[in-house]
Amino acid sequence: MSLDVTLTGQKKIEWNGKTWSVWRKDDESGEWEEYQEVLYEGNITHNLGDMAEEAGIYNALWRPYKLSPHFVETDDYDYEYEQEGNITVLASDISPLIREGLNKINADPEHYKKFDSPNGWGLYKHFVSFVEEYLEALEKYPNAVVTCDR
């Protein structure tokens, strides 16, 4: 099992010295809507969840909707799932927290290596590489919408 993260944003094109937004007409409704494109995709094993938790970035990576002021803590799985689908998280909402966590991880590698998966599927070096790459994308596309699939 793994975590898949995706950043999406409005498609833009350069033409005649200007930047244009791309729109498309929905086949079913006939309504015009902004065309969204995938800006970044990443994947990491769930075996690194404990390492992320220790660094204080589990929710930022796996469940960013929980960081929203609109999120209501609940024991009702269906209601939480509904909230996840209804709360929009932007890259800029989570990038500072992820940077802070990455700094913690890089400051004490030996501590975080204690969370390496015994089977080798999920090691410190994999986690650092994933977080660095993801953070770079988050900072490059601060207005991108973040989605996570667990």
Where would I find each of the regions flagged by the language model?
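Acidic (Asp/Glu-rich) sequence patches and key acidic residues
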Residues: 1-150
